[in-house]
Regions:
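Interdomain helical connector at the RecA1-RecA2 junction of SF1/SF2 helicase-like NTPases
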Residues: 207, 407-496, 510-520
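Conserved RecA-like ASCE ATPase "motif II neighborhood" in helicase/translocase motors
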Residues: 338-385, 569, 573-574, 590-592
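Catalytic cores and motor modules of nucleic-acid processing enzymes
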Residues: 15, 19, 54-55, 261, ...
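Short, conserved "post-DEAD/DEAH" coupling segment immediately C-terminal to helicase motif II
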Residues: 154-159, 376-394, 622-624
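Conserved C-terminal RecA-like helicase domain
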Residues: 337, 466-590, 749, 753
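Conserved helicase ATPase motor motifs in RecA-like P-loop NTPase domains
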Residues: 268-269, 373-377, 389-408
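Conserved RecA-like P-loop NTPase helicase motor core
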Residues: 344-345, 368, 529-668
């Protein structure tokens, strides 16, 4: 059977939507879109309008209210009422949406043509009450779905205006792969923020027909638009929740309303638990049967990152003071149903007799406690105190690494002991499969002489003493390995790293060694210390170590911090490690800080010289696995201790596969080794050569189909090359039987030339199949053009063939135009 064309796919989807209760409506252009909106607005508000449709002037006033807004402003307006005086003096309130699915009018149209900077036709548009709220772009089977995303990007820039700013959700599909994502005012759409829709048990729904049955169910679509979109006024964007976040929210709310029991959500680290927990708290606070919802966090976790995260969802919602009295005032306020506070303040309020009169009012009422990152907090210790007071309270915890029998807490408690039932799971294997977090490339480096067996505990773990691990020879070996390999691990320093050490003395020794080598790496260190620590066996007090490290930091980054301004110092480190502030920190040395709860997309590498197991291991590794762009395909973990067994057990436990045998089926969370990517590079290089046997032959690819084939082949090759170069053992000699380094650079140059032509020089009025192709340009790490490179090009000029010589010289001219080397600019 042949490929289904886009037109066939479009018609099939429309017929499917008609069976789901959508009315087919023909809308040819923007004027007809406005006319249809007017008709549906009148129908939807028939009671408020007392059966008197809007006059021309009144509708014009409605359009004036709705138009001229950004995507974010439009989303806010969509959820509000429009109030104005009618021509006869009557005051009315018009609604644009109803939370009751059956109250709304659902329509579907296709091929709406809009003339903006260029003329564009939109594939399929879903309208609710006449407003275009969902836009669907389709590609035929076999076409990369990213091309549909790029097409939407063009539409947003060139022709979306007015009512099209009310689009909340985009859907892209090639019939066998389907994704959805939120609209945005950002200049470019991030492909990392496009999501697969799934079942409640995290099974992906890829086929467009199945996706339509679930996602475009009218009640589900309305919930996804109204309940499960978040207006982030801090970052000025829309957030659409992912399916597992939605299902977890619904499961928790059902459990809270239908039972009096507790529960917990197990969603892997990095999957967006804070948003899910916040949404649960927000929705529960709107239920009449619930008197108060307390969102509890630990005082020590109320850092800058936590405050930023919470304030994205509701501005100024976090009370940063340590005053218990402030909390009690909030509890006393009957109109304030949702309270964000710390576990410590809540426990203090309950224990203090002077607040009993206020708190006793809720002793027998239904109240909800939601605990984010429930195992990072002291909730277990204070649970009894709080529970003793609130007799009908329900407790809901969120965790990425639950406590089981294997890793129960110091007091012997498991997650189920505190929170009873697990209500929803989204495990690390699910998140990696869905591309919501990255997998790990793990290297175990031998740091002791003799034959190293990663499964032989007697070689490393059996001699776990400070004397051995902190020997000068070993410190030198580890330090030099880090310095020699850091650039390849971090893509020439594009990304940042954390170095986890076993103790403050170990950190100090590594810090001093790196400093003494005068590398060009910018390093920093941070740790907490005890004022009255035992100095036996130590050369230096931890406080003094930190003081001199801060002095170094001030010189390196032109700052003025001290021990007294530790919080500001820590904040500055956070910003530089996240590359929010320049210059960035290349490597941050830590002991325990930053190994849990720290989220940074630009962090891609963790060096480990400490023993880790179970939840501590997964939490530490997960600092590196936030999705960013194609140049960050995985998190790099470099272990200088024998953590192989601990890693396997921990990752299996938190993927619910502790007993699984993965000998024949490698786990999804571990990236294949160097050999796999070396062989893959060769395979793709030979494929590239079958399309363009020589660099010059790229110029002879006259048809757009042939050019497209070349672009896709080189793009895939470049992705593997970017992975290969992160391995310390990589050498071009290993792959030169397929393609040499110079050959790769030459093909890359032609690739970039074609990219420039498509993006900058092509006549924009002419439709091209190359318009929306994904060049994945971020993985083509363009090194600075140097003299050696240009000389190699000159040596390869074909002087015998005048036509080819002209092409070669033109190519060299283009390369010179790219350079910022003044020696070549002259």
């Amino acid at each position: 059977m042949g490929y289904q064309s886009e037109a066939e796919l479009e018609n099939k989807l429309i017929e499917k939507l008609k069976t789901q209760g959508y009315e087919r409506v023909l809308i040819n252009d923007y004027a007809e879109l406005e006319n249809n909106f007017r008709e549906q607005l009148n129908k939807f508000n028939i009671i408020a309008l007392e059966n008197k449709p809007l006059t021309d002037k009144e509708f014009e006033r409605v359009l004036n209210v709705l138009n001229g807004k950004s995507v974010l402003q439009s989303a806010i307006k969509l959820r509000e009422k429009i109030d104005f005086d009618r021509e006869d003096g009557t005051k009315i309130y018009l609604k644009l949406l109803s939370e009751n699915a059956e109250d709304n009018i659902y329509q579907v149209s296709n091929q709406i043509t809009v003339q903006g900077k260029y003329k564009n036709r939109y594939d399929v548009t879903i309208l609710i009450n006449g407003l275009p709220l969902v836009q669907i772009e389709l590609k035929r089977s076999g076409i990369d779905i990213n091309e549909a995303i790029n097409q939407i990007d063009r539409y947003r820039i060139h022709s979306y205006r007015g009512l099209f700013h009310y689009i909340q959700i985009y859907v892209v599909s090639n019939s066998v792969e389907t994704r959805y994502f939120a609209n945005t005012d950002a200049q470019r759409l991030l492909k990392s923020l496009t999501f697969y829709w799934t079942t409640e048990t995290n099974e992906r729904i890829n086929k467009l027909e199945d996706f339509s049955s679930s996602f475009f169910n009218k009640a589900r679509l309305l919930k996804n638009v109204i309940r499960y979109m978040v207006i982030n006024e801090t970052d000025k964007n829309l957030i659409v929740m992912r399916p597992y976040q939605i299902y977890a929210t619904e499961a928790l709310i059902r459990h809270a309303l239908d039972t009096g029991k507790n529960g917990y959500i197990w969603h892997t680290t990095g999957s967006g638990k804070t948003l899910t927990s916040w949404k649960c708290a927000n929705l529960l606070s709107k239920e009449q049967s619930i008197k108060k919802v307390f969102f509890l966090i630990d005082r020590k976790d109320l850092d800058i990152q936590t405050k930023e995260e919470f304030n994205k969802f509701e501005k100024d919602c976090v009370d940063e003071t340590d005053k218990t009295e402030t909390l009690v005032k909030q509890i006393k306020d009957i109109d304030r149903k949702l309270i964000v506070t710390t576990i410590q303040k809540m426990a203090n309020a309950v224990k203090n007799p002077k607040y009993s009169k206020i708190l006793d009012k809720y002793k027998e009422e239904k109240v909800i406690f939601i605990i984010d990152e429930c195992h990072r907090s002291q909730f277990g210790e204070m649970h009894t105190t709080i529970k003793h007071h609130f007799k009908r309270a329900q407790y809901f915890g969120f965790t990425g690494t639950p406590r089981f029998e294997e890793n129960k807490s110091q007091n012997g408690l498991k997650t189920s002991d505190l929170f009873e039932k697990c209500l929803h799971t989204y495990l690390i294997k699910n998140a990696i499969y869905d591309h919501n977090v990255l997998g790990f490339s793990i290297e175990y480096i031998q740091t002791f002489k003799g034959q190293y067996d990663e499964n032989d505990k007697t070689m490393v773990e059996g001699i776990d003493t400070d004397e051995v691990y902190m020997a000068d020879e070993r410190i030198d070996l580890v330090t030099n390995h880090i310095i020699n390999n850091h650039k390849c691990k971090t893509v020439n320093g594009k990304y940042t790293a954390i170095f986890a050490t076993s103790s403050i003395p170990a950190l100090a020794k590594y810090y001093d060694k790196i400093k003494s080598l005068n590398s060009d790496l910018k390093i920093a260190a941070v740790f907490s210390y005890g004022e009255n620590e035992d100095l036996e066996g130590k050369d230096e007090h931890s406080k003094d170590i930190l003081a001199r490290i801060i002095d170094d930091y001030n010189k390196e980054f032109d700052t003025n911090f001290s021990l007294e301004t530790f919080a500001a110092y820590n904040k500055d480190i956070t910003n530089r490690l996240k590359i929010k502030k320049s210059p960035k920190i290349d490597i941050l040395l830590v002991v325990n800080m930053y190994l849990t709860g720290f989220d940074s997309r630009p962090l891609n590498t963790l060096y480990v010289d400490k023993n880790l197991e179970w939840h501590n291991l997964v939490q530490a590794f997960s600092r590196t696995n936030r999705v960013e762009m194609a140049s960050k395909p995985f998190g790099n973990i470099i272990c200088y201790r024998n953590l192989k067994s601990n890693t396997d057990k921990a990752l299996r436990l938190f993927s619910n596969e502790l007993e699984a045998n993965t000998d024949n089926n490698p786990p999804i969370w571990i990236i294949p080794g160097y050999g796999y990517f070396r062989d893959k590079f060769k395979e793709l290089a030979f494929k590239l050569l079958s399309i363009a046997p020589t660099v010059q032959s790229v110029d002879d690819l006259m048809s757009e189909d042939a050019q497209r084939e070349f672009v896709i082949a080189f793009r895939e090759l470049s992705k593997i090359k970017s992975i290969l170069t992160t391995f310390s053992e990589f050498s071009w000699a290993d792959v030169e039987d397929a393609l040499t380094c110079q050959g790769y650079e030459d093909y890359k140059s032609r690739y970039l030339t074609l990219y420039d032509f498509v993006k900058k020089e092509r006549n924009a009025e002419k439709v091209s199949i190359l318009d929306d192709i994904d060049f994945a340009i971020e993985v083509i790490q363009t090194d600075k053009i140097n003299v050696t490179y240009i000389m190699n090009l000159l040596r390869n000029v074909d002087t015998a063939n005048k036509k080819q010589q002209a092409k070669d010289l033109e190519h060299i001219k283009q390369e010179l135009d790219r350079t910022d080397n003044p020696e070549l600019r002259r």
